[in-house]
């Protein structure tokens, strides 16, 4: 299921009603723990994530049991446009959730989360949600359609990667 303009109730940032949003829930033929590990392996994103050209983890801190918090810089590029943004990434293994909180870069706001639900030992349901608003109207006009198209391919890129890694 792919739905535009909606996300989980109560989870939107202030002003999110006008922000571009994308959400999808997909059933995959891989274990939830495997899919969590794949998405949590952010250093590998440049190998397969649309628009991602570089990703550097600046900081990695273990918190509560099974919870790790990263500060990461992601560089996205399309043609002549190249932008880097910094996010706080909370990897919550016990709850099978990944929360991405925007810290700095070309956005006014951005929020993103992943939720992994086991269906069986070999099947899981993955929820992906993102909403964002560029700081610059010009950049938003240039990159908005490109980002929309990339996010539609995002979940597929992770599914293809899982098929390759867990085959």
How does the language model describe each region?
Residues 99-153:
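Beta-strand/loop substructures that line and gate deep hydrophobic ligand-binding cavities in soluble
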């Amino acid at each position: 299921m792919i739905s535009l303009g909606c996300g989980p109730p109560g989870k939107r940032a202030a002003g999110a009603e006008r922000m571009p949003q994308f959400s999808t829930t997909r059933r995959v033929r891989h274990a939830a723990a495997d899919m969590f590990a794949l998405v949590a392996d952010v250093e590998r994103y440049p190998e397969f994530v649309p628009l991602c050209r570089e990703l550097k983890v600046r900081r990695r801190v273990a918190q509560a049991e099974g919870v790790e918090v990263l500060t990461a810089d992601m560089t996205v590029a399309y043609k002549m446009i190249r932008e880097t943004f910094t996010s706080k990434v909370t990897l919550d293994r016990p709850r099978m959730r990944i929360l991405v909180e925007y810290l700095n870069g070309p956005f006014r706001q951005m929020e993103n989360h992943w939720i992994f639900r086991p269906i069986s030992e070999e099947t899981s349901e993955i929820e992906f949600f993102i909403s964002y608003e560029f700081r610059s109207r010009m950049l938003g006009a240039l990159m908005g359609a490109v980002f929309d198209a990339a996010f539609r391919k995002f979940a597929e890129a992770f599914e293809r990667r899982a098929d390759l890694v867990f085959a």
